[in-house]
């Protein structure tokens, strides 16, 4: 009974001082001290006094500023980026930004502008990026031209513009990006384009405008970085209108909801009169496709035929000898050989993703592509019991291979011996059957990145990753370990060059203290979404300066002896753990507040215990674990009782002694 009373006494003594101090600051979020702030969607009608004068980057969208003038932002003279998206701005008065000499980006997207003064943009010495998307502009005369000499990008999408004719004094010399997408531009004249003559290597976007006519010679002798006429139903209009022009990239893709004309071989002859390096024709249909369909593509280096309903390409096609990149994703091939790879002798990059039908690899279908460096065959339901030597025959220069999101693949020893130069191999979400005692990757001496996410591997095979001397990035997410434990001897011991290791969602319960002992070069370790306790932190004691993700585990109390291990890391994520916020964990809670600069996900790092603090951020908790006033009172009473007890005990002993002399 005395023991129970004393325990109760100490509980009262030390728990009476536990309390939480929280702050619910609804004002702007500081992203970088004194420089970057987010004030989005706070219902503000003016700049808060809490923002420092040194603010450089301000996100102020979804507030209420119907009128802005030269006093609205005058205090923030160091602004370089200002986002005023959907602030219901109607009026921008004279000299609004006169004191903002360093402002380079101004976002006015989604504001129903009625008036912009001629001098409203005066002040910034190097305004480079101006966003006027969804502002109701119907005429380019609305845009004030003063002080736009250094403008590099102008975004005018989703307005009511029907003519791209700029004012005569519009400064286009430094313009690099001009975006007119989703307007009402149906005709482009020579006079319209004359105002852009000074712009060199311009990226011009007419996507979603349904251009129906281009005056002959409008693009004559012009040079563009990119041209986008996406969603144009009749491509003949574009090919005829772009005669004698030069562009690095021409985007002519369409969309599923647009009823456009099929592409004919005759239509593509318009490319003979222009110079193009990259062409996108996605979502179109070919009325006929023959060996001469692409005969005008002699200068083409990149071709995107995504979702063009192709079932095969004829052999002996002309005009594609210089092609280096080919995209054939979302088509209807039955077998890889149907692409007639011999048509593309210079090809270095091939992408066939998401084929509509189950794709069969065949044997040696790509052997004519001896220069191929990148091959993406993901999301194709590919299935093979013996992969991949015969299928990838003669691809000795291949550096990147993506076989992710496919059906089960069987891998023999040296399964990729035809691709000894591989640097990146992605097999994520493809069930692998390893049919050999040795590693299927053992000849890949240059492999740096290996993605084995959810491959259902036998992780007890200690030789699985043998023969990868320069592997730097390994993703084993979703592969479970026997008994939920990574033991001292494990499959990671053969990859000592690792810098990034991802072991999230592996069902881990514990990690042996010596499990990572051979991995001394690691800089990034992801152990999130497991069931690890704080004891597993010991396995990281030899690592310093790493990014450590321990989110969503079973960590509650972190003992003081483990804090030095955490202190020596650069970034730590402990969010979504059932952390204890009582005095039993006071050393960790103190350390946490002292190291907030190292912690990621602090908004989601909350208390789970005691119930009164559940859901409260650790950074908002303040515990008082010393002796409180109530505790002192009880202590005095306890000591007084103890003194009385001792007094009577001594008195009793003395009386007993004298009685027995």
From Swiss-Prot:
Residues bearing glycans: 34, 53, 70, 78, 201, 234, 244, 394, 402, 451, 573
BP GO annotations: B cell proliferation involved in immune response; cellular response to lipopolysaccharide; inflammatory response; innate immune response; lipopolysaccharide-mediated signaling pathway; positive regulation of lipopolysaccharide-mediated signaling pathway
Intervals, Extracellular compartment: 24-626
An annotated GO cellular component: extracellular space
Residue ranges occupied by any LRRNT domain in the UniProt entry: 33-53
Tissue expression as described in the entry: Expressed mainly on mature peripherical B cells. Detected in spleen, lymph node and appendix. Not detected in pre-B and -T cells.
SUPFAM superfamilies: L domain-like
Subcellular location: Cell membrane
Primary residence: membrane
LRR repeats: 54-75, 78-99, 102-123, 126-147, 150-171, 174-195, 201-221, 275-296, 299-320, 322-343, 346-366, 371-391, 397-418, 421-442, 446-466, 470-493, 497-518, 521-544, 546-564
Keywords associated with the record: Cell membrane, Glycoprotein, Immunity, Inflammatory response, Innate immunity, Leucine-rich repeat, Membrane, Receptor, Repeat, Signal, Transmembrane, Transmembrane helix
LRRCT domain location: 577-627
Membrane disposition: Single-pass type I membrane protein
Leader peptide range in chain numbering: 1-23
Ranges in the topological domain labelled Cytoplasmic: 651-661
Keyword Membrane part of the UniProt annotation: yes
Subunit (UniProt): M-shaped tetramer of two CD180-LY86 heterodimers.
Function: May cooperate with MD-1 and TLR4 to mediate the innate immune response to bacterial lipopolysaccharide (LPS) in B-cells. Leads to NF-kappa-B activation. Also involved in the life/death decision of B-cells.
Family per record: Belongs to the Toll-like receptor family.
Classification via PANTHER family: MSTPROX-RELATED, TOLL-LIKE RECEPTOR
Protein name per its UniProtKB record: CD180 antigen
Source organism (scientific name): Homo sapiens
UniProt gene name: CD180
